[in-house]
Curated annotation (Swiss-Prot):
The chain crosses the membrane at residues 4-24, 55-75, 84-104. This is NADH-ubiquinone oxidoreductase chain 3. It catalyses: a ubiquinone + NADH + 5 H(+)(in) = a ubiquinol + NAD(+) + 4 H(+)(out). Keywords: Electron transport, Membrane, Mitochondrion, Mitochondrion inner membrane, NAD, Respiratory chain, Translocase, Transmembrane, Transmembrane helix, Transport, Ubiquinone. Its EC number is 7.1.1.2. It holds the Pfam family Oxidored_q4. It is a multi-pass membrane protein. It comes from Podomys floridanus (Florida mouse). GO terms for molecular function: NADH dehydrogenase (ubiquinone) activity. The lineage of its organism: Eukaryota, Metazoa, Chordata, Craniata, Vertebrata. It is found in: Mitochondrion inner membrane. Core subunit of the mitochondrial membrane respiratory chain NADH dehydrogenase (Complex I) which catalyzes electron transfer from NADH through the respiratory chain, using ubiquinone as an electron acceptor. Essential for the catalytic activity of complex I. Core subunit of respiratory chain NADH dehydrogenase (Complex I) which is composed of 45 different subunits. Interacts with TMEM186. Interacts with TMEM242.
Length: 115
């Protein structure tokens, strides 16, 4: 019962915050806020530079594996637990999911800079 109540409160709170986030920016639409500030001068060109999607994919991959290391670092302390099989299976599942994601990205040529 307690877990069900926590889940329902989290879902309701998340839904409310998402609805507010979509509704709130539509109240005040100012075109001047979208323009870059150029110290009083009119902008010569667009300030919105294109972003490399390849760099974004490599950065996300780096963050995922950095998170993996952060999650696996407490394993030596977790070995002191009585249920080692549960801890090892959780670590194996985590590493397997990340390895499958890396293999998929590699096969889709997401890590190559040139085509």
């Amino acid at each position: 019962m307690n877990m069900l109540m926590i889940l329902s409160v989290n879902i309701i709170l998340s839904t409310c915050l998402i609805m507010i986030a979509f509704w709130l920016p539509q109240l005040n639409v100012y075109t001047e806020k979208a323009n870059p500030y150029e110290c009083g001068f009119d902008p010569m060109s667009s300030a919105r530079l294109p972003f490399s999607m390849k760099f974004f994919l490599v950065a996300i991959t780096f963050l995922l594996f950095d998170l993996e290391i952060a999650l696996l670092l407490p394993l030596p302390w977790a070995i002191q637990m009585h249920n080692i099989n549960m801890m090892m299976s959780t670590a194996f599942i985590l590493v397997s999911i990340l390895a499958l994601g890396l293999a998929y990205e590699w096969l889709q040529k997401g890590l190559e800079w040139t085509e």
